[in-house]
Amino acid sequence: MTISLRDVTEENFEALMDMELPEHQRDLLHTNAYSIAQARFYDVFVPRAIYQDERPVGFALYNREDDGRPGCYGIYRFMVDYPLQSQGIGRRAMELLIAEIKAQPDVRLINICYHPRNERAGAFYKSFGFVEIGIDCNHEMVAEIRLR
C-alpha cells in the first residue's frame, strides 16, 4: 500500500467531496466540499488529496500563513474516508503532510486545532510531536510543533 499526497484536481474533487466521517465525528470537522471551496477563494490554503495507490482516500488542508503570521503553517483539515479509518493511512498521510510543510523555506511553526474532548485526535497529533498549548477563542485545543 502506497500513500501519497496529490493536488486536488478536476478528476478527483468529486470523490473527495463524497467522503464521509462517522456520525460521532461529523460535528468536529467541516466537510471536504467546504474546505475545497475555501482553498479556491483564499490563496493561502493548500488542499491535498490523500491517495492509497491510485485511489483518493482522504483529504487535508493547510495554510501557509496562519492568522497572518508568515512562517506559521496551520493544518486546518485532515480526514480519512470513514470505511478506511484505523488502517494506518492517516498516520502515513500525516507524516507526509508534516514533511511537505517542513520543506517550505520559511516554516518555523506548524499548528493544529481540535476539539478538546477528542482524545483520540489529541493522542494522534501528540505522536507526531505536537505539543498542546491551550484552548483558543473558538474553544478548540491548539497544539504546535516549533521548528525555530
Task: Show which residues each predicted segment covers.
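Conserved beta-strand-loop-alpha-helix junction that forms the acyl-donor binding cleft
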Residues: 111-121, 138-141
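Active-site acidic-Proline motif in GNAT/NAT acetyltransferases
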Residues: 81-83, 87, 116-117
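Terminal substrate-recognition subdomain of acyl/acetyltransferases
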Residues: 141-148
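Conserved GNAT acetyl-CoA-binding A-motif
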Residues: 101-113
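Conserved acetyl-CoA pyrophosphate-binding loop and the N-cap/start of the following alpha-helix
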Residues: 84, 88-96
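Acetyl-CoA-dependent GNAT
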Residues: 3, 7-83, 100, 134-137
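Short glycine-rich hinge loops at helix-strand junctions in the catalytic core
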Residues: 88, 105-106, 129
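Conserved active-site alpha-helix within GNAT-family acetyltransferase domains
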Residues: 91, 116-134
